[in-house]
Every structure is written in C-alpha cells, then in structure tokens.
C-alpha cells in the first residue's frame, strides 16, 4: 500500500500557523514555539497558507461610517494616478458659498491632518494662497507638528479689495508649526519688465528661491473659468480667460496655467507671473493638492495626469468623478 502524501499534513500545519497568526494574534516566534518549528519555518508556513488560498483578509468599513470613510476610493486613486497617498474627505456638512473658506472645511481638516502627519521639523513648507489653504491653516492643531519655515509660493498683492488669505496662512502656520515666515511681497502678475526688476530684488529672489526648493508644497487648484479665484479677485478678466482657454488651459496652480495633460501653457501671462514655476512644483516630493467642488474636477484631473501632485485630498464627488474618467 502506497504511503499517504505529505501534502495534507503540510497544509494542516500551514493552516494551523495561519490560524494562530491571523485569528489568535500570536507572533511568528510564539507560533514557532507552539508548533515546534523554527521561526523562519513559521513564517514560511504563514506565507504558504496565503499562497494556497487558505487565508482571506477582508477590511470592512463599519456601516455607520460609510459616509465618512472611503478606503476603496482612496486606494484606487493611488493606483490609478501613482499617488503617494489619497485622502477622500468625509461627508461633513460645510456651510458657505463656493470659493469661501467655509466651503472647504471638510477637505481643510483632512488636508491639515495629512500635512501634520507628513511634516518633519527640518521641512520648508510652501503654500499658494486661496480658500483651500486658509481652511487648512484654520484646521491645524498646535503641538502636533513643526517645520523650519513657511514660504509663500505666489504673489498676493492686488489693487482690488480681495482677501487672499496669505497673511492669515503665514501667521497661523508660523504660530502652530513654530516656523519662520518667508513672505513674497509682490503681486501675482506684473508686466515683464517689472517682473525682471523684482527678480533682481534680494528679498523677492530669496523668497522665490526658497519656494522653488521647498520640501513640502500645499495648494488648491483653480479652474480656467469665471468660477476661479483669480477671476473673482480681478487678477484676470474675461478676455484673458478666453485667450487662455483657446490655448488649451484648463487649470492653474499659483497663477500658472496648464493644459489637460498638466503641461504648462506658455503665454505672455506666464512671463508675468510672480510665483514658483510648475516644473518646481512637479519636482517636489511632497506636493499636496486640495480639490473640492465640481468646478475643479477637470483641473484636478489634468494636474494628476501631469504629476503635479504626489498627495491628493478631495471630496467624495471629486474622487468618484476622477475614477470614472479614462
């Protein structure tokens, strides 16, 4: 009579090791002692159980938290766009007109939590002004994280009575993150000769240089439309917007416009911008893009296609829209 195959006993041992590891919570060293095998053998038994399909791991979102936790969408966004991390904000009720900081409270809280987790004390953090970054600064918690300096990435001075929030962001981040502030005392756009003159100014040139080499950059995104912050703040008019759109512009970061593939749109306006160039944004290893609202969908998709962000914080509607695109 033929000797019985050793395979069933091998599987029994693998199943036993997997049960002790996944269900009973034992370490590999404890499993090795329990089964009378070496620690490497215990590890191989657990791996064999997984390889043979004896282990099924299921991550379950509690039913009462399904409106606030979106792990599946986050994972798919990371895989689809090659992101370091995606955070989909919960369904907290935000009260406020579109474009106002209150309308970004949920993504602001989520982005603040992500930022505090990613910051290290030696980092220089750059930001672009806007309601999204105002919401982030508002949501920062004292004593959780720190960085070396906070630098303004785009000019904010304007003749219009428009509140950019740049001073609030600088002051709040400096206080909460115990950081040095580096202001950019310049307008967002100026004529080319003025821009050239400003670049020779030691304060402005040092600020732009610090921004270009920031370890962390956090920014909202603007649409190339009258729904954008730049139009609302009178930095652009309809004629300028029409020209940008005719050249393929779909969105902007720091006043610098890009097309549907996230590539810079080279116009006369680009020569007038006083802000960190998009190539420096793309080169930064920790870029956090905040997106919320239907008006930002196409610009967000373009920025992700162009690898202008490594980390994304968005609302669930934006996440689902992005995942529906091909």
Model feature map: region roles:
Residues 2-18, 22-31, 36, 41, ...:
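Conserved phosphate- and dinucleotide-binding cores of soluble alpha/beta proteins
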Residues 84-87, 149, 180-182:
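Conserved beta-strand segments of alpha/beta enzyme cores
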Residues 143-148, 306-308:
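Conserved S-adenosyl-L-methionine
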Residues 8, 44-124, 138-145, 158-163:
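HTH-adjacent hinge/linker in prokaryotic transcriptional regulators
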Residues 149-157:
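Catalytic or ion-translocation cores adjacent to nucleophile or general acid/base/metal-coordination motifs
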Residues 89-90, 126-132, 292, 316:
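Glycine-rich beta-strand-to-loop/alpha-helix junction loops that act as flexible
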Residues 132-143, 229-238:
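Short Gly/Thr/Asp-enriched flexible loops that form oxyanion-binding sites at enzyme active sites
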Residues 122-124, 149, 286:
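Residues that mark the start of a beta-strand
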């Amino acid at each position: 009579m033929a000797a019985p195959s050793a395979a069933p006993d091998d599987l029994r041992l693998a199943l036993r090791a997997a049960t002790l590891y996944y269900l009973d919570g034992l370490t590999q060293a404890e499993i090795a002692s329990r089964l009378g095998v070496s620690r490497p053998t215990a590890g191989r038994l657990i791996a064999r159980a997984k390889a043979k399909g004896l282990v099924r791991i299921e991550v379950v979102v509690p039913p009462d938290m399904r409106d606030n936790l979106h792990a599946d969408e986050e994972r798919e966004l990371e895989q689809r766009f090659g992101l370091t991390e995606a955070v989909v904000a919960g369904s907290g009720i935000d009260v406020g007109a579109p474009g106002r900081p209150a309308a970004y409270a949920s993504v602001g809280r989520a982005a603040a939590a992500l930022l505090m987790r990613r910051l290290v004390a030696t980092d220089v953090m750059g930001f672009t002004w806007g309601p999204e970054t105002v919401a982030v600064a508002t949501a920062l918690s004292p004593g959780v994280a720190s960085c070396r300096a906070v630098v303004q990435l785009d000019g904010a001075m304007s003749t219009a009575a428009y509140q950019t929030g740049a001073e609030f962001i600088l002051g709040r981040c400096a206080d909460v993150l115990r950081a040095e502030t580096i202001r950019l005392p310049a307008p967002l756009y100026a004529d080319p000769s003025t821009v050239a003159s400003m670049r020779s100014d030691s304060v402005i040139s040092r600020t732009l240089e610090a921004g270009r080499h920031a370890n962390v950059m956090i920014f909202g995104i603007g649409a190339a439309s009258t729904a954008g912050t730049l139009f609302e703040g009178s930095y652009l008019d309809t004629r300028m917007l029409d020209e940008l759109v005719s050249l393929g512009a779909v969105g902007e970061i720091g006043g610098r416009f890009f097309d549907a593939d996230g590539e810079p749109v080279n116009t006369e306006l680009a020569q007038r911008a006083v802000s960190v160039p998009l190539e420096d944004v793309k080169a930064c290893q920790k870029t956090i893009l905040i997106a919320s609202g239907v008006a930002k969908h196409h610009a967000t998709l373009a920025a992700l296609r162009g690898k202008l962000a490594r980390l994304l914080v968005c609302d669930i509607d934006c996440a689902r829209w992005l995942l529906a695109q091909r």
